[in-house]
From Swiss-Prot:
Coiled coil: none annotated. GO terms for biological process: translation. It holds the Pfam family Ribosomal_S11. This is Small ribosomal subunit protein uS11. SUPFAM superfamilies: Translational machinery components (SSF53137). It comes from Nitratiruptor sp. (strain SB155-2). One of its GO terms (molecular function) is rRNA binding. NCBIfam families: PRK05309.1, uS11_bact. HAMAP family: Ribosomal_uS11 (MF_01310). Part of the 30S ribosomal subunit. Interacts with proteins S7 and S18. Binds to IF-3. Belongs to the universal ribosomal protein uS11 family. The keyword Ribonucleoprotein applies. Located on the platform of the 30S subunit, it bridges several disparate RNA helices of the 16S rRNA. Forms part of the Shine-Dalgarno cleft in the 70S ribosome.
Length: 130
């Protein structure tokens, strides 16, 4: 099947000063999304989209690279201040938060953990025996 040739949508550079960085750290991957204050996505990146495959996606280094990539895209839109919202139990979670704070020209306003916790809802999966 031939690739579709058409006009690609041009990325419009917005001038947004404040944003929110959502870090979703699962056991298998880390997804970083940068939004404006209204929740509209400005930039995103993940360990898998950067070329990490298999078990390498879940490493702290892959999470750090995903954050740096997403923040580089967001800086093109003028982001200077961000809040951080972290979700999930993944191994790349702490490294991702530290690497947001280490980026030059970005000021962190707040940090919040939004991991959903059940009030004794569904039964969890059985323990893994290796």
């Amino acid at each position: 099947m031939a690739k579709r040739k058409g006009a690609r949508k041009k990325i419009v550079k917005k001038n947004i000063a404040r944003g929110v960085v959502y870090i979703n750290a699962t056991f298998n991957n880390t997804v970083v999304t940068v939004t404006d204050e209204m929740g509209n996505v400005i930039a995103w990146s993940s360990a898998g989209s950067l070329g990490f495959k298999g078990s390498k996606k879940s490493t702290p280094f892959a999470a750090q690279q995903a954050v740096e990539d997403a923040m580089a895209k967001a800086k093109e839109h003028g982001i200077k201040e961000v809040g951080i919202k972290v979700q999930g139990p993944g191994s790349g979670r702490d490294t991702a938060v530290k690497s947001v704070g280490a980026i030059e020209g970005i000021r962190v306003l707040f940090f919040k953990d939004i991991t959903p916790l059940p009030h004794n809802g569904c039964r969890p999966p059985k323990r893994r025996r290796v």
